[in-house]
């Protein structure tokens, strides 16, 4: 992956947000004593900070060159696994309780990994990262199902949207010229629509002062989806999805804080 000036700037912003949230987490009363979940989130933030530090420094020193596999790849995978552990602690149901939804999520991640490899030709990073990311996405599916935050129609619409998104991305690879640009724009708009719907649901839940379980489920799902979006993006759309990702990091913090404080 290569870094542009705008991407480095967005990385600096996310780094600052992660540092801010980490400091606030460390100041929470009872952190590490009353809730193991806060600790998992804290560790995930630490890994995110190391990942962003590497990304920003490398981007500044080697602008426009492809980043080789390095320690930051391990940090990125650790972020996904630790966030998944956060959810699994609150929502301990096994994957087979929701086989259809989990299987669909696994297929989406598998298809995404294939596309990542086509774009980057980085087999090892993409496969290892995909395994960690897939575990997080499946954990989000279980959390959403447990809290019943989506109707049956919403699940079907989400499944259809994911199928269309993969089809559009394949179309981008197999076509050229205006047709390829059309597929690309449609894919970006579809990803943004998904983010908008999750964000709207999250804002609604926060306004209603819902319980921490629902807030964890929706904010972690938003982070996961927006991560998938910027993995499939470039240029200004990459920055857009990255900013949305930062918003969900802050929402995750509010949800975890509510859980730690027992609010």
What does each of the following model-derived ranges do?
Residues 2-5, 24-33:
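Short, hydrophobic transmembrane alpha-helix segments
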Residues 1, 59-67, 177-179:
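Membrane-interface interhelical loops and short amphipathic "cap" helices
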Residues 10-24, 36-61, 72-82, 101-117, ...:
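Hydrophobic alpha-helical transmembrane segments of multi-pass membrane proteins
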């Amino acid at each position: 992956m290569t870094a542009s000036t705008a991407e480095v700037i967005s990385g600096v912003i996310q780094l600052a947000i992660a540092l801010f949230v980490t400091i606030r987490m460390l100041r929470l009363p009872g952190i590490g004593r009353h809730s193991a979940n806060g600790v998992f989130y804290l560790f995930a933030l630490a890994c995110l900070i190391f990942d962003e530090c590497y990304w920003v420094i490398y981007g500044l020193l080697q602008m426009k060159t492809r980043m080789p596999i390095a320690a930051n790849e391990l940090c990125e995978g650790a972020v996904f696994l630790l966030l998944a552990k956060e959810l699994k602690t609150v929502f301990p149901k096994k994957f087979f309780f929701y086989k259809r939804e989990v299987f669909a999520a696994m297929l989406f991640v598998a298809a995404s990994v294939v596309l990542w490899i086509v774009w980057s030709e980085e087999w090892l990073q993409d496969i290892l990262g995909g395994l960690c990311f897939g575990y997080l996405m499946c954990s989000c599916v279980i959390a959403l199902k447990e809290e019943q935050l989506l109707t049956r129609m919403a699940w079907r619409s989400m499944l259809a949207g994911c199928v269309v998104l993969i089809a559009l991305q394949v179309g981008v690879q197999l076509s050229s010229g205006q047709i390829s640009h059309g597929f690309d724009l449609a894919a970006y708009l579809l990803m943004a629509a998904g983010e908008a719907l999750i964000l709207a649901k999250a804002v609604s839940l926060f306004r209603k002062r819902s319980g921490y379980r629902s807030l964890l489920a929706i904010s972690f799902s938003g982070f996961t989806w927006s991560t998938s979006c910027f993995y499939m993006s470039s240029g200004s759309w990459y920055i857009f999805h990255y900013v949305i990702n930062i918003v969900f990091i802050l929402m995750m913090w509010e949800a975890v804080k509510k859980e730690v404080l027992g609010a």
